[in-house]
Amino acid sequence: MKTFIGTGVGQPEAAVHQAVQGLTSPSAILFMASYEHFKETASRLKELFPDTPCIGTIGTRLVNGQVNDSGLAVLGFFSDVKIRCGIITEASRCPVAGTTQLLKQIAEISPGTDDTVCVE
């Protein structure tokens, strides 16, 4: 599996610029940012990669042997990875409402028992 890992520090514009240096044509992006910069980071990544599914999270991250609570980490996936993304709506009121769509997306990628990850 071909992947890209990039990191950036500072305000979202600078951090995103640093983190995506060398990232071209990803099939999907997973990013980890600080809570205070999360929204702007997501917006900037979407501007740069408008047709790429992008999933973000907050929290402590371990990248290249460094543990960090601030800054940005970007993980890019490429065409050798099958990706399906969606939004689970009504999660607080009726979490099973999105089950049909989720099962459809899972079937589309033909998951195996040792080569599949589901990120919630």
PLM region spans:
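Cofactor- and metal-binding active-site motifs of prokaryotic enzymes
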Residues: M1-E120
